[in-house]
Amino acid sequence: MPRTISLAVVPGDGIGPEVVHEALRVLREAVPADVSLDTTQYPFGAGHFLETGEILTDSDLAALAQHDAILLGAVGGDPRDARLAGGIIERGLLLKLRFAFDHYINLRPTTLLPGVTSPLASPGEVDFVVVREGTEGPYAGNGGVLRRGTEHEIATEVSVNTAHGVERTVRFAFDLASKRERKRVTLVHKTNVLTFAGSLWQRTVDRVAAEHPDVAVDYLHVDATMIFLVTDPSRFDVIVSDNLFGDIITDLAAAISGGIGLAASGNVNPTGAFPSMFEPVHGSAPDIAGQQKADPTAAILSVSLLLDHLGLPEAAARVTAAVSADLAARAAGDPAPRSTAEVGDAVIRALSTNH
């Protein structure tokens, strides 16, 4: 039955438009013949803010909410620009979208793809997914300052953990693990020190685990997790954690699997009540913008996550396979740098070959 995907596209700043352009080319090539793509571009980002004074208005949110999904490039301007200080774009755009659209799952697959060199001497088979809670923890904005600027200043940042928020995240992790070959969930926290929040997470995992007898479960403190990520990353299958620990884990996970230049992510609302957003993890790199130097691989892998989320797993697998083939060919062939468009061309050729 014919289907149309309504996609909001936010190219953003710096290299964002270049990598998104290639990601869209791959997406159009990957979707099945009975699926059409209807894209609407939005100008949000640092450049838009500097021109208009607006970051993301209520009417912007209402427009974005009408789409099936969002593809984001990268946002952020010149870090030396005082008008952009304090993470104003990241908070006003990315975090605002996350909370407004209840993106309570931050999904970060970590795979050491063929031809990619890990900084680890013997990484083994690296293939795991981090399920990070996305709307609570210390990022919820529950905190404040008293006596600012004095020697008696008090700053608080409260980590918010609700039974509802923890359970829906844990259930997502177990559902995901049950579909994977190794079927294993690792809870990462610091229950020996953060006893109140840690207890809530552990009790929730224990309760949900009882409903999934086919899924193995273990627990690691976050500091031990950091050690195992660099000494034995192949032990992990699905990691579930809170917002702060998940944020830290995912960056190290990207580093051991080739760097953030290859890392894709999904900010997901699994209920479908709002569109989920998919993006490369890397920044806007304004120093190389417009020079065709940026590698669009992470943006293309974000398209794979997008397709899988929209119920097109075969198309998603084809995109990942095409990226894997291109990375392997790069490692075996000419090491000379390729332009952004040339990488897109190569992935599309690989897609066509594996159709």
Swiss-Prot record:
Binds 1 Mg(2+) or Mn(2+) ion per subunit. Keywords: Amino-acid biosynthesis, Branched-chain amino acid biosynthesis, Cytoplasm, Leucine biosynthesis, Magnesium, Manganese, Metal-binding, NAD, Oxidoreductase. Pfam families: Iso_dh (PF00180). It catalyses: (2R,3S)-3-isopropylmalate + NAD(+) = 4-methyl-2-oxopentanoate + CO2 + NADH. Its main location: cytoplasm. Mg(2+) binds at D223, D247, D251. NAD(+) binds at G283, S284, A285, P286, D287, I288, A289, G290, Q291, Q292, K293, A294, D295. It is an enzyme of class 1 (oxidoreductase). Pathway: Amino-acid biosynthesis; L-leucine biosynthesis; L-leucine from 3-methyl-2-oxobutanoate: step 3/4. SMART domains: Iso_dh. The keyword NAD applies. The record marks Y139, K190 as: Important for catalysis. Signal peptide: none annotated. The keyword Oxidoreductase applies. Belongs to the isocitrate and isopropylmalate dehydrogenases family. LeuB type 2 subfamily. Catalyzes the oxidation of 3-carboxy-2-hydroxy-4-methylpentanoate (3-isopropylmalate) to 3-carboxy-4-methyl-2-oxopentanoate. The product decarboxylates to 4-methyl-2 oxopentanoate. This is 3-isopropylmalate dehydrogenase.
